[in-house]
């Protein structure tokens, strides 16, 4: 049994996540965590709401509300939505907890005392109209690398490059649109130059990093790591703990990534020191799930912080980074109301349908697009015709024609043995894909088992065999039933509710991954059999989209984001 810390990128809670945010981090992490637990591993799965930083502060200023009130209300909503999506966090917390604040301040003081932090005066943008400094998302402009018109002061969300506000072309205040002036202020910097060689070694020698994470990180290292300011002039955030840093806060990205540690500290707060058995054990496997725009902070910044701290933290095993999920071929956009957000999705279909669809099209190696035409095809042809139909064919036949209990192994032919051997080989292939965090390929392989099963039933025709050779019919249905155990196991991480129903139908009360490898027990009574999934028509989809627009219109008049969420 191995020990794992699984973390999904902490969502900003200025709004609820959309489907692209979900598949890029939280849902993918949940599927992997569920798989590992099902295999019997020791898993701690944590995340939380990113409460600080400019997105919240900008929105709060524009609405005339206190940032803390705003963030806490949105945190409660997002936490509830994740429960409704069946996300199996061991702890979903937030970055304004006492545990996190104290941990971050102590962590950075240690880095400061180790000599990796220095101070420097610099010119920073200031809005004379709003009378505030403009760090990060308070300032926008054209990206100097890709030309994107709304790049932020800390990062371009289009190309993913980390930026400095001075690099922006035609910068302007994100609140009022005014051109900023530049003022001298003092900030505290993490000297990444001192850590560059060790970071390069970590990236180059890490066999687990996906190609996009390795390529982006090596590109940054090739350019040379520059010192990064870790303080801001924001009012909303964690107060910087350094001598003379009164009025400064820790830059949100430098403190949020430490949440993966502070969340484990909080989880085990009743057992002092237990968290160290996860984060300071070199045998622990630490895996993060992020979208590709978060790669620099998880593959460069967090390892740098852990090394600079020097207290024996285990470096992350890998960062499972996806490409982008598009909606009908275009990027999700709140302002253009383009896409589907996770509260809206649950008004349209149960979570297992969404979970299956999103994992089936997970953007592992390239950007992929959610389209309703594709969603219908996945639901109707794959979930129903391939998987659901095969399950129903096997179980209703055993229920109606074989007394409702698992038949004996019978007298198998070579064809029957070849079938179950093929099923086990496919299941092993799915297992390897899950182990490699190739979740899409794992699910596709589970579907292939069902397709093999449908072909097998058509070829063997047990309804005919039953009339002339009961032993051969038993052999066929015994192995068909066995194949359903592999499907149930393979679906358990992806569609937990449906998989739980399938295990009940199979008459198995204590399911496990290894159960799929075990020959069935003859005489096991089946549970109640019913169709696992249902089909949707094009008309139903049209009705869903119409309902979605009606719900959005009703919410458009609401002033505050927490009033606009569908619960």
Swiss-Prot record:
Enzyme Commission designation: 6.1.1.10
GO molecular function: ATP binding; metal ion binding; methionine-tRNA ligase activity
GO biological process, alphabetically ordered: methionyl-tRNA aminoacylation
UniProt binding sites for Zn(2+): 143, 146, 156, 159
Alphabetized SUPFAM superfamilies for the sequence: Anticodon-binding domain of a subclass of class I aminoacyl-tRNA synthetases, Methionyl-tRNA synthetase (MetRS), Zn-domain, Nucleotidylyl transferase
Main location: cytoplasm
Name assigned to this protein: Methionine--tRNA ligase
Species of the source: Pyrobaculum islandicum (strain DSM 4184 / JCM 9189 / GEO3)
Gene coding for it: metG
């Amino acid at each position: 049994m191995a020990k794992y810390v699984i973390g999904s990128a902490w969502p900003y809670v200025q709004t609820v996540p959309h489907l692209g945010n979900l598949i890029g981090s939280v849902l993918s992490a949940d599927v992997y965590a569920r798989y590992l637990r099902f295999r019997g591993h020791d898993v701690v799965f944590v995340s939380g709401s990113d409460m600080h930083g400019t997105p919240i502060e900008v929105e709060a200023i524009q609405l005339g509300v206190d940032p803390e009130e705003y963030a806490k209300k949105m945190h409660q909503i997002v936490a509830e939505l994740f429960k409704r999506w069946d996300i199996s966090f061991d702890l979903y917390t937030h970055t304004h907890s006492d545990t996190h604040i104290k941990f971050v301040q102590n962590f950075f003081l240690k880095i400061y005392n180790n000599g990796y932090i220095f101070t420097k005066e610099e010119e920073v943008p200031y809005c004379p109209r709003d009378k505030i400094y403009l760090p990060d998302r308070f300032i926008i402009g054209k990206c100097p690398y890709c030309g994107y018109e709304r790049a932020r002061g800390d990062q371009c969300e289009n190309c993913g490059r980390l930026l400095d506000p001075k690099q922006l072309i035609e910068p302007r205040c994100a609140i009022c649109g005014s051109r900023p002036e530049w003022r001298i202020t003092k900030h505290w910097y993490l000297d990444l130059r001192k850590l560059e060689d060790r970071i390069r070694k970590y990236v180059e020698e890490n066999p687990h990093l996906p190609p996009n994470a390795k390529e982006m990180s090596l590109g940054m290292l090739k350019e040379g790591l520059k010192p990064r300011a870790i303080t801001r002039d924001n009012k909303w955030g964690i107060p910087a703990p350094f001598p003379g840093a009164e009025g400064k806060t820790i830059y949100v990205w430098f403190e949020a990534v430490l949440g993966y540690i502070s969340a484990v500290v909080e989880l085990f707060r009743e057992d002092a020191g237990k968290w160290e058995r996860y984060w300071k054990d070199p045998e622990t496997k630490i895996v993060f799930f992020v979208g590709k725009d978060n790669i620099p902070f998880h593959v460069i910044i967090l390892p740098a912080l852990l090394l600079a701290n020097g207290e024996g933290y285990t470096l992350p095993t890998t960062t499972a980074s996806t490409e982008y999920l598009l909606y009908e071929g275009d990027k999700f956009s709140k302002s253009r109301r383009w896409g589907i957000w996770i509260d809206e999705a649950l008004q349209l279909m149960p979570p297992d349908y969404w979970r299956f669809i999103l994992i089936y099209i997970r953007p592992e190696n390239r950007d992929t697009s959610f389209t309703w035409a594709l969603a219908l095809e996945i639901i109707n042809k794959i979930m129903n015709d391939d998987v659901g139909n095969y399950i129903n064919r096997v179980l209703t036949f055993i229920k109606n024609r074989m007394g409702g209990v698992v038949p004996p192994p019978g007298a198998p032919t070579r064809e029957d043995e070849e079938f179950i051997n093929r099923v086990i080989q496919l299941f092993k292939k799915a297992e390897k894909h899950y182990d490699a965090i190739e979740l899409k390929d794992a699910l596709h392989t589970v579907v292939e088992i069902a397709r093999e099963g449908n072909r097998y039933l058509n070829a063997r025709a047990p309804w005919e065999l039953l009339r002339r050779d009961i032993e051969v019919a038993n052999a066929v249905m015994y192995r068909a039933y066995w194949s359903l155990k592999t499907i149930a196991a393979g679906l358990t991480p992806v569609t937990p509710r449906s998989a739980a129903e399938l295990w009940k139908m199979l008459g198995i009360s204590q399911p496990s991954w290894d159960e799929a490898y075990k020959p069935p027990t003859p005489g096991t009574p089946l549970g109640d059999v019913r169709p696992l999934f249902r089909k949707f028509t094009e008309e139903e989809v049209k009705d869903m989209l119409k309902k979605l627009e009606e719900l959005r219109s009703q919410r458009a008049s609401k002033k505050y984001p927490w009033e606009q969420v569908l619960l």
